[in-house]
């Protein structure tokens, strides 16, 4: 049966209106799915200044340059009504330092991985605060080029950190900008440290390993990591500038190996959407 020509435009209009009405009902559900599956990833490279002072190797302070790379992933979860966000942050740095007498050098390296959750507290539509906890894993070394008996010092420690963030989405003359400040404070953990004057040969070959793993907290490991980032679009890409202030301090087994770093970093940000892996039975 053929429809009269005047009715065809009416039917098309009704179908379009129904389609629009159906789409208008989707955002509430679709937005929930997007928030829990939208992953923000950033890779950055940076350079800065570092101070290394390890009394196990030398009583002198060494200063120099720090090269650093980082990889971060953040996404919202469905836990606690979608208020919990998951963060994974990995960074590795390599330092080359020299003493004040200008007659000796050291190489230092440290890999750090943070993984944990933050609860989101929206203050306004553009500003929110986050608070949570992170697992904090660290491993590295300091190598003194002139020492012969004990040329290197290992660094290995695990912490439970308290962490906080402030994220602000703003516009400067219609140009979008996202600012973030994050601070991580180690609350408690365990650290490997030889006794002062004890060689690694005694620990691993002779078995004199008593007391080389110690409990740490604010009283003997007052450390702090702070990071300030700025995300902004450049064409179709999104860039990130970051400043990291990394202060690692401890006083365990009469050894003090503090290190302080100020690093400027730059990189790119990607936003990915995780799809469900549907398997056919």
Task: Tell where the protein language model's regions lie, with residue ranges.
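Outer-envelope beta-barrel architecture signal
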Residues: 34-43, 80-88, 125-133, 173-179, ...
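Cleavable N-terminal export/targeting peptides
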Residues: 1-37, 274-281
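Short glycine/proline- and aromatic-enriched beta-strand/turn motifs that initiate or cap beta-hairpins
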Residues: 24-87, 281
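Transmembrane beta-strands of outer-membrane beta-barrel pores
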Residues: 47-53, 92-98, 135-143, 168, ...
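Residues that define the transmembrane beta-barrel architecture of outer-membrane proteins
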Residues: 61-70, 105-113, 127, 152-162, ...
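Predominantly the C-terminal beta-signal and adjacent terminal strand-loop region
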Residues: 176, 182-184, 192-194, 214, ...
């Amino acid at each position: 049966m053929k429809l009269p020509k005047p009715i065809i435009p009416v039917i098309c209009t009704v179908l379009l209106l129904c389609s629009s009405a159906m789409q208008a009902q989707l955002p509430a559900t679709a937005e929930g799915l997007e928030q829990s599956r939208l992953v923000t990833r950033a890779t950055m490279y940076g350079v800065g200044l570092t101070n290394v002072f390890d009394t196990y190797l030398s009583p002198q302070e060494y200063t120099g340059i720090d090269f650093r790379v980082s990889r971060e992933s953040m996404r919202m979860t469905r836990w606690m009504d979608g208020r919990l966000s998951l963060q994974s942050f990995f960074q590795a740095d390599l330092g080359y330092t020299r003493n004040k007498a200008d007659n000796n050098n050291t190489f230092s390296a440290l890999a750090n991985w943070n993984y944990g959750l933050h609860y989101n507290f929206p203050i306004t539509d553009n500003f929110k605060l986050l608070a949570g906890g992170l697992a904090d894993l660290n491993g590295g070394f300091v190598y003194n080029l002139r020492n012969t008996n004990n040329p290197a010092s290992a660094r290995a420690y695990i912490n439970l950190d308290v962490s906080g963030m402030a994220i602000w989405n703003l516009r400067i003359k219609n140009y979008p900008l996202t600012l973030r400040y994050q601070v991580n404070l180690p609350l408690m953990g365990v650290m490997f440290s030889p006794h002062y004057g004890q060689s690694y040969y005694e620990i691993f070959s002779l078995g004199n390993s008593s007391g080389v793993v110690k409990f740490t907290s604010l009283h003997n490991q007052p450390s702090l990591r702070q990071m300030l980032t700025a995300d902004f679009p450049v064409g179709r890409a999104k860039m990130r500038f970051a400043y990291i202030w990394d202060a690692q301090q401890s006083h365990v087994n009469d050894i003090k190996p503090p290190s302080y770093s100020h690093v400027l970093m730059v990189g790119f940000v990607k936003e990915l959407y995780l799809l469900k892996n549907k398997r056919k039975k």
